[in-house]
Amino acid sequence: MAEAGDENLYAAARDIARALGKDPSAAGDILQILSGYGASGNRGGDPRPTPSRGGSNVNFDRALTSLERQISSYIVEDRPIWSDPVDSRTFLDSVDELLAIAGDLRSMAGDKSVAVCQSRADELIQQVMFRLQEEFGFVMDRAPDSFDSDDEFPGEEDNDTSDGVIVARPITDYKIVIEALQSSVIGDLNAIAVRMVAGGFAKECSRVYSSRRREFLEESLSRLHLRGLSMEEVQESPWQDLEDEIDRWIKAVTLIFHVFFPSERLLCDRVFSDLPVSSVTDLSFMEVCRGTTTQLLNFADAIALGSRLPERLFKVVDLYEAMQDLIPKMETLFSDRYCSPLRHEALAIHKRLGEAIRGIFMELENLIRRDPPKTAFPGGGIHPITRYVMNYLRAACKSRQSLEQILDQTGNETGSDTRPLSVQIIWVLELLESNLEGKKRTYRDPSLCFLFMMNNDKYILDKAKDNELGLVLGEDWIVKHAAKLRQYHSNYRRSSWNQVVGLLRTDGPYPKLVENLRLFKSQFDEVCKVQSQWVVSDGQLREELRSSVAGIVSPAYSNFIRRLKESPEINGRRGEPFIPYTVEDVEFIIKRLFKESSS
């Protein structure tokens, strides 16, 4: 009868508390007052005694019987205990008492007389823990409903939900924290977590928590428009598609590591506060982040292990730099022993991206070596391989600091002032020039060989001036290359015009002068006809060449004509010999040398 009275008394307490507006604190006060009375309502002994260490087996038995009755009444209910604040408070009080008794029993483990009670307590704790595990999930599942309709994520007017999961919208301010759960919900979760850890169910509690939070992160990641490609899919996808995916990946990973993961860490710290050890917090945070982190890292790893085609350099460098920027954040967020494998994997992938970039430079070298001379390039203009390599290197040098770090494999232990990127690029340019030397041999006209080299070297020099590429190459390289360009210019002028101008010597007899004039016209016409079809794309170089040619031909021709007219042999003759061109005619024809393009 006394036991039935106890049940009626506690049932009455719950009814009174509900009538007072479901105030958990009021419920606790009422339960505390009424728990001191027996079934008759008189103040009496505690119906659920907590024996001292030396207490009798009978006291333990009575206490466990009372707890079994009260706890079982909650466990058998289909309705969630945490749907009612009074019930949750009462249930936690019973759990606390059960854990206290179990602790006393464990301290008396050597006493065979309490073995049966200890077994009963352990069995009841198992039942309680399983129910708390369910309740923990219930509280997390109902968390979105606890938000007011006006609650919003920063930077958005609407707060989307999908299947009860709060979904983060795109934001631009990384110095924010997502308050995914209200303080009251966090308090409930913490209360359950403290009991589950005390009951030996820390991993189970962590598992329930992390599964719910992973769902939030996965849904949020999908809203960032990442395709979630497997490593095989990355390897098979067209590079143009992957370029777009890399851009989305960089934005997503920045947001994840600067906003979402720090917010999840703070939430873990609050939910699992007041625990005797931090391992539950660290384990839970790792489990929450592991799936998302692995997905992000797998994509970067697939890119790192993919093709080394030269056109991939720039996006791979973007990935490398994004990882580089995130490493300090990872070092902070993933500092504990549970997260250290994620941190180490990120560092390894960052290293593999660097290896991929070095491999891409090697493939660029091979591309230059494999580019065959084939047939002569029309007009001796700038070869496509020259344009490709120079624009490539110029674009690459925009990431100069990263490339310096990547290419410095030895850490410059020799103390040399030579920078690894400078060495690499100069080597690529040497390969390019060697390739161009092979291509110039396809021209039968030596003058066109020199013009071809002049065109390409002028393009190389112009691309290296006044930009990051020039800073990498250094002033000495530019000065030496300018001298080489002048030498090509001199060689062209000598091979093209020395023989033509040589016909304008004035030290021969009159008949010889007349013959030389005829030969000059023939050769001059032929050279100008041919070279008017040659290509000099650079306007400045084109004018310099024309001026240079005019500078040696015009004075020689003018002097020759004057000498011819003044020759004594023409005295007494009728008129002067036939002179095909005036000096102005020669200069006009020279101005028609070369064209801007081969089209």
Swiss-Prot record:
GO terms for biological process: cell wall modification; defense response; exocytosis; positive regulation of defense response to bacterium; positive regulation of defense response to oomycetes; regulation of defense response to fungus; regulation of stomatal closure; response to bacterium. InterPro entries: Cullin_repeat-like_dom_sf (IPR016159), Exo70 (IPR004140), Exo70_C (IPR046364). Target of the E3 ubiquitin-protein ligase PUB22 that mediates its ubiquitination and degradation via the 26S proteasome to attenuate pathogen-associated molecular patterns (PAMP)-induced signaling, especially is response to the bacterial elicitor flg22. One of its GO terms (molecular function) is phosphatidylinositol-4,5-bisphosphate binding. One of its GO terms (cellular component) is plasma membrane. Pfam families: Exo70_C, Exo70_N. Component of an exocyst subcomplex specifically involved in autophagy-related, Golgi-independent membrane traffic to the vacuole. Regulates autophagosome formation and autophagy-related Golgi-independent import into the vacuole. Positive regulator of defense responses to pathogenic bacteria (e.g. P.syringae pv. maculicola), to the biotrophic oomycete H.arabidopsidis and to fungi (e.g. B.graminis hordei), especially in cell wall apposition formation related to plant defense. Required for both immediate and later responses triggered by pathogen-associated molecular patterns (PAMPs). This is Exocyst complex component EXO70B2. It comes from Arabidopsis thaliana. The lineage of its organism: Eukaryota, Viridiplantae, Streptophyta, Embryophyta, Tracheophyta.
